[in-house]
Amino acid sequence: MMMSSSQTPVRIAFVFLVILAATDAHSDHRTPPPACGGAAVGGECHSVARALRLKLIAIPAILAASVAGVCLPLFARSVPALRPDGGLFAVVKAFASGVILGTGYMHVLPDSFNDLTSPCLPRKPWSEFPFAAFVAMLAAVFTLMVDSLMLTFHTRGSKGRASSAVAHHGDHGHCHAHALGQADVAALSTTEAADQGSGDVEAGNTTKAQLLRNRVIVQVLEMGIVVHSVVIGLGMGASQNVCTIRPLVAALCFHQMFEGMGLGGCILQAGYGGRTRSALVFFFSTTTPFGIALGLALTRVYSDSSPTALVVVGLLNAASAGLLHYMALVELLAADFMGPKLQGNVRLQLAASLAILLGAGGMSVMAKWA
């Protein structure tokens, strides 16, 4: 009897623990799952208000950089320091390319990996395949394919000697260096030499064949810009990560300015009228801001704290990283490093290489706290 009474407290304690465990299990079952995306993933970098402020600043900043880049060739003749064939221009351009590379690899791509490998997403398929790297690779290859196909279609559609000039002397036109890559690059100062070497095409930009060739180049460059600028702007507009948006604004301003210089030189050489020039400048300058505005509208479609936000922003960031990689290496750097200006000047080539490292290194250091 005494043994039974001594076991009573033990039994009461056991029953109490069972009830407590059942209560905890029941409360855990009714507690909603933690939010995915938003501050749960971005931490201190996630801020809808600050991100919106940066986007609203980015739209006019990128617009101004685009307009300045396109219009700069108009004044380059009177200001020697601003001429695209100068050594200082090549070094500054290399530094800007390093900034673009660093932004893509050190800021945008890591955020894409974080979003697409978040534990908030289903393990299948997001944790079993590197979607971020895959989409970045596809974006770069797709941009190359679009540029190449557009050049092919425009070349076949052009008749007479101008099409032959594009096919055989494309490597002597600086104005399309940003769009067509290594096989189509060189300095503006070598254009006349290429025309003299062609035999049947008169020297100068006033001939009919040369004008048609330059107009084909402008159309190819313009369409390529529209494709990738909208995608990158869309990725920035959809992101709520301040640490991603801040360096991306600087990188896009650099890119739009230098690519605008290339397009502006093309437009001048193509001999377009004032109305056509204005239309080309307008479309170039507004594509990236339009993409940002479109991304802002996209954020209204889904909840910022949902798995959908992680997938959408992660995929767009991955595509943006691939495009930044392509733009920096193919459109900006290959044109100069494989051209005669840097190939014939080792000191200038080393200075440009150092500028790339400084630009990319600066963005890498920023990734430590931004």
UniProtKB/Swiss-Prot annotation:
Name assigned to this protein: Fe(2+) transport protein 2
Protein function: Iron transporter that may play a role in the uptake of iron from the rhizosphere across the plasma membrane in the root epidermal layer.
Topological region Cytoplasmic: 77-85, 152-215, 269-278, 331-349
Any single GO BP term: zinc ion transmembrane transport
Record GO terms (molecular function): zinc ion transmembrane transporter activity
UniProt keyword Cell cycle present: no
Localization: Cell membrane
